[in-house]
């Protein structure tokens, strides 16, 4: 199991002030081994709503869970050396609503994955994944 937890942030899109809310989900994860920045990396996160709770008058917090398997080829490895790594964590989204939500759903768009590497280095251990998300509060 991966001991290094991912950094997960959800950023509200400009102008998204009412449900459905448009978000960009960013998952940054340190990989167990270095991989080439130009090599394909596969990570398709599964995102689900865990719960929502009232934290103040008209203010609710939606807790979501992200998980998936990252598949990559380490540097110095060939196509037979593919590694997999579990990526899992949670994030929260604050929601203002006049009445308590009765249902909260989440859908995802197409994920874009990159390996973040300095210009002078061709290998890195840092996965950066971005996924568009629609959060619907009813």
Residue ranges and their predicted role:
Residues 1-138:
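Viral structural modules
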């Amino acid at each position: 199991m991966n001991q290094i937890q991912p950094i997960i942030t959800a950023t509200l899109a400009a102008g998204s002030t009412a449900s459905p809310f448009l978000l960009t989900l960013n998952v940054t994860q340190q990989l167990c081994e270095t991989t080439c920045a130009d090599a394909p990396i596969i990570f398709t996160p599964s995102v689900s709503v865990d719960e929502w709770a009232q934290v103040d008058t008209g203010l609710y917090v939606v807790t979501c869970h992200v998980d998936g398997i990252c598949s990559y080829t380490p540097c110095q490895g060939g196509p037979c050396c593919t590694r997999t790594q579990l990526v899992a964590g949670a994030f929260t989204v604050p929601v203002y609503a006049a009445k308590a939500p009765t249902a909260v759903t989440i859908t995802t768009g197409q994920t874009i994955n990159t390996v973040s590497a300095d210009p002078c280095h061709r290998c890195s251990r840092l996965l950066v994944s971005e996924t568009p998300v629609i959060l619907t509060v009813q």
